[in-house]
Amino acid sequence: MRDLKTYLXVAPV
């Protein structure tokens, strides 16, 4: 699930 980590990482919150 690399997409999830990328999203979190990108999430400003």
From Swiss-Prot:
Domain of life assignment: Eukaryota
UniProt keyword annotations, A-Z: Chloroplast, Membrane, Photosynthesis, Photosystem I, Plastid, Thylakoid, Transmembrane, Transmembrane helix
Protein's cellular compartments: Plastid, Chloroplast thylakoid membrane
Bilayer topology term: Single-pass membrane protein
Transmembrane segments: 7-13
Protein name from the UniProt record: Photosystem I reaction center subunit IX
Organism, scientific name: Pisum sativum
Alphabetical GO biological process terms: photosynthesis
Function summary: May help in the organization of the PsaE and PsaF subunits.
Family from the record: Belongs to the PsaJ family.
Any GO CC annotation of this UniProt entry: chloroplast thylakoid membrane
